[in-house]
Amino acid sequence: MKNNSNNCFITINNKNYNLTEFIDVSDIKEKKLIIKLNGINKITDASYMFFNSTMCALPDIDQWDFSKVINMKFMFAESPYFKSLPNNISKLNTSNVTDMRHLFWVCNNLLSLPDISEWNTSKVTNMSKMFCCKNLKSLPDISEWNTSNVTDISGMFDGCDSLVNLPDISNWNISKVTSLENLFSYCRNIKYLPNISKWNTSNITNISCLFNGLEKLLAIPDISKWNTSKITTMFSLFNQCKSLKSLPDLSKWDTSKVTTMGLMFNHCENLTSLPNISVWSVTNVEDMNYMFQGCKNISSVPDFSKWKAVKLRQKNGMFDDCDKLVIKPNIKGKSD
């Protein structure tokens, strides 16, 4: 947390700490109670402000002026005792904030968040791993957030094990986003996702683990028209989507730049067929390890004989435990 005034201090357990230098407030030992925060209107950097806090509750923040704050990364992260946060967090002026990465990350006792739906996110560029709280039962309505300048939302909901619904983020502007890695990964109790079919994915390079570990997911939105022309990795994309019975038509995806497809459909145990991915360009793919492993209800696969996997180096166990697959294709790689 950084500011530029000699009048800024934090009072913890009746002792004042000067905030004129960059400090991690979590370094102040045995903080149980923040009594007051003076000079909060001078602060520009609130990163790590309550990181790994031992407090059970935060002070009233009605008087906080966040209008100059540009950095909120890790602000509440890894604070194991927070079960809730003050409702008036919703009133923070976030109009100049550019970084919200890991904001509530691993606050594993949080059951809910205040209504942050009206936060001004117009300047935010990084929202990666923003939530990642395994006991959160619900999230505020963040459907109207301005994401037009965001470049990274990777892992934003990663590991939110207790969520049964996600906010409707279907209309988010992700035109500048480059990574969707782990975005919904291990949201184990989600059955349906927002309709993300119309997302502008023209700048996405990484969709690794996007739907990884969604064990109860019953359907994938129609992502058949996604622009995948810049994507280089699809590692573990649908891995462990054990309840899925079908996938969208992926035949028109441009995979010409993809280098990694390992674990892509691994343990999609209820799939009975695959999309026609035999038309994919795999000329740059180097890794297909365990790509279809554990797809135990698939009895046939597309004709992969036309695949030209000239750079393929790793293809271990591609069709292992595909119990109903009588004839297992031999995908030829670089050494074949």
What label would you give each PLM region?
Residues 1-336:
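Negatively charged
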